[in-house]
């Protein structure tokens, strides 16, 4: 603990100033108190008065307050420890060794004279007395083991040192610390002046100390001689010379005491007769117990009814009256309060002192830096010396500066006993170098001045503030073993005065020395007075030898520099980076300029090696370091003068570089020969090499001191941080790239797969058509060989077939897609018939396309010729007769075919019906082939004219061969596009032997095209079971069952008659029924025919049945193929047929009335609409479309209501009950089930019809409300989340609030906006009323806005009151947030959108041009 450079009076005054309390006493007597010595402004009379009552300098009545002041607690001592006794033989021995006299006349038996210790001192290793210290400082040193327990301390009582006691008594007898342990000694307390505490060292005291001690002696003598001794008391506490109290006074005294222990009615009377108070009896008793007031003190009552009595008498009467038990209990409470208050004050004082020290240190450092900057400015105008001379002069100055600084510090910190001459020379030398700060000549001298100034100020006050925090964990054991229990053994190395040219002679600039740590001047003492005297003699011998004294001071200074570095290293870490940077720059510049002297490094290395061998340490001399530092600084200063770029930061770094680099000097700690088991403090181990900071940076905290778990935790945190950074960068870098590649590859694969599929289908179709063409050619060749004699008409047909087979268009016409059919498995007869059916179908479609090209009558005739030609090629000779008859029938109907519209409809219906018999027909390619070759169409039309004549001839021949079997053939009206347009009649007398099975199939095909399989199976049923089994194997066998063939003929005749009967109707009625008949023929199939329908036909029938009839009029011939190619698209757009939908046969009754068959009763099926109906939208109304706020200007609503129609007004006022914008939901397009809302509506209607009551009540609405939860929203702030699944169109919650008028809503809106609430909870019902849910509303007001909401609002009138209900717009899953659309036209620019949905309605108020662009884009998409 470093001593503070102050005398007794100043120290006591500063300490008493913080303990002073407010009192009613006059300031001239008690205004300035101290611990041990009175101030000069206090008179002798006042001191005598104070001694009468407190008997010491601190017993002033001014220090007494209403809260009892325990002096033991003031010093921070533990009063709970037990007291003990010890002999004071050591104290007597110390008293004899000190040689101080014993003053008489101060007997302990005198009760009025109480002794108090105002300060404490102890002797150091050099025999010097250090102090005075307060009791708290000694107690802190003892508790932290900084001071040993056996250290002898001397109390200062009334300005004089008393007998010494061990420091451990502070813990053993805490109650006697305030009295200086005077009452523990049986002898007389010796109060002697401390003029010379130790005779050997008295000659070295300063003149100032002699004057102070002389003054103290005079004051003590005056106090002893003029002391007024109070009257003595006996052992029972009664006053000897005091009169006994009479009965009246006793009663009056008892009455005063009966007022209470806390009643303040007693005054203390001083020597001059003045009263001080009032005080309570408890306060007086407490002061008496702690010795603050003597028993002989006079006490006077407040009313002055009693004469003054002594305190002992008053306490005795009080004890008798209230009893010991009752008195001790309140005293304990008061004592506890006083202890707590004093403890708090002590802690507060220590905190204030620490802050004051730090503030003082900051002020010192700032003043030093400012002085240095001023010196630097003045130094810039001076011319620097050469580096060689500067090194020599500065090296010598540094040594002298170190000596002067250390000596000056020792003289200021302690009461040094050296002679006056040595002190004055050191002071003169110190003042000489202090002047150099004001008149600095170069940069190096300023550095030495700064270091000296730092030493001078920091050595006094920085130990507790800096060093103690750094070495507190290891200082206890180390100082106990190395400082307090060993003798000083200062080993020094004399400076060599040899030549400076030889480094082997150890010149002064390279001298190194070692020192012992126990040479510190501020922390040494001995266990007894004999050691102190011996050390005093040793120090006196060292002071006689000047050279030895200088070496001791130099060693101490060097050690202090090392400790200063250890403390600065922890507090000046900010400058380490600057130093490292400067060192690196210096080394780099030196290497670049070639100024590194190789010999100097070699010599330095040799020197370090030799010193290491001697001391076992890597020691670098301090003077050498100073020289190098100053030379580098000189070089930097010269560069700075030329460039003028030296900043204050670089200067400060260079200032501390010298102090920091002195840490390279290690401390050679030689431990005791005794067995010491305590570990040495860090940095003081033996044989440790300390590298220079110039080449290597030393961290403040070593790596070994870091716990292993902290290292693992740090590594884990670093890895986690690195992982997060890498993952974030990876996602942003690769995710987008991979997504683009995936989309590009997906798109490309779709395109490639589509192209490959189309190419594969086209390739298969071409191959199949080639095979069909080849087979047809072979069949035609065989027919020619079998029928050499053919009529003219047959020759024309053969020529036509050749042209069709040779032309390229035949390949396109015959492109047929037949999936799931293997042609190789069929028999030749089956294959031939299949090909014939396909060609027939393609020819009919060809006729339809030609009619679209306005070929007209010729084109249709051509189609008939082509069909007849193909039939004649493939059938046998007897089939030609049937074909001729068919041509004759078509010839009779050429007049009706001239009507283009009817013919077009006929062809379209033929094509639609023919598609059902085929698996897949590629009409698109056929259409392209026809459009690419118009010349072929013209040729075909020309050929059809030539064939028409032949048809007439063939008709005459066919009529004759029929033998008049059919007298009146029914005519086929041109309105039908089915097989009726190619109407035929078969004679009942046609021999069934001449009809082959193939011909029967042909007849069925012409009668019911599209039902090829059905007709074939129907005829198969008419045959015998054996023939039915052979139907798929041998179709050329003419045998059959005659009865069943007859039945088949009758069925064909009846069908033909019924069809011809319809032809007799007018063309007008046929046109009206055309649409219904088309749908009926596709969908309504007789039961016997529906059994034979294939899966493909059924699918096509369903598609065509659901197709819109209105589009059927404009449907081209190739549209059915498109529908057949993409059935999935149509199925997705249309609802499937209901399960309960039934099909009815179109033929109700075939009976004949009046010789004429009745028309077929047709009943169309009820079909679902293929397209959803479009609802009417009202967009011109300035309403809040579900928005939870109102318009700023209500006149918009008023202006609109004046112009609006009655219908719109009624709708807004709630007559329509709902907002039209939210009618329906998307789920209605994909679901065919009744929603829960519909079921409830039906139930309400039933109940209302049954009971006649209004069932729509609020209780039902509350029961229907869904379970929602109020929680944090992902959209904005707070929101509502569904806790259960909610179906579409279900009621969710009601928007509840306060119903106000529009004018009031505008006022509230402005108020809400000023308050920061906003107007998002105002919901407009109509142009007159607004629903305000800001302060009085339900949780529905927290539903957030979304541009893609899942709910919508409805305004419904319930019992004449409009209410706002929120319904689900779509299916809402559990956990999904409820939202609806706030937006409406008037306030798009006022409400910001936070939903973040990728919707064009999500406008942004900060960027208006983006909103316009989005709106324009959206409207363009709609158009």
UniProtKB/Swiss-Prot annotation:
It is found in: Nucleus. One of its GO terms (cellular component) is Set1C/COMPASS complex. It comes from the Eukaryota. Keywords: Chromatin regulator, Flowering, Methyltransferase, Nucleus, S-adenosyl-L-methionine, Transcription, Transcription regulation, Transferase. Disruption phenotype: Early flowering. Reduced seed dormancy and increased germination rate of freshly harvested seeds. Residues 1057-1071 have a biased composition (Polar residues). The keyword Metal-binding does not apply. Expressed in the shoot and root apices, vascular tissues and mesophyll cells of rosette leaves. One of its GO terms (molecular function) is histone H3K4 methyltransferase activity. Residues 923-960, 1057-1097, 1115-1158 are annotated as: Disordered. It catalyses: L-lysyl(4)-[histone H3] + 3 S-adenosyl-L-methionine = N(6),N(6),N(6)-trimethyl-L-lysyl(4)-[histone H3] + 3 S-adenosyl-L-homocysteine + 3 H(+); L-lysyl(36)-[histone H3] + 2 S-adenosyl-L-methionine = N(6),N(6)-dimethyl-L-lysyl(36)-[histone H3] + 2 S-adenosyl-L-homocysteine + 2 H(+). It is an enzyme of class 2 (transferase). The keyword Metal-binding does not apply. SUPFAM superfamilies: GYF domain, SET domain. Belongs to the class V-like SAM-binding methyltransferase superfamily. Histone-lysine methyltransferase family. TRX/MLL subfamily. This is Histone-lysine N-methyltransferase ATXR7. It comes from Arabidopsis thaliana.
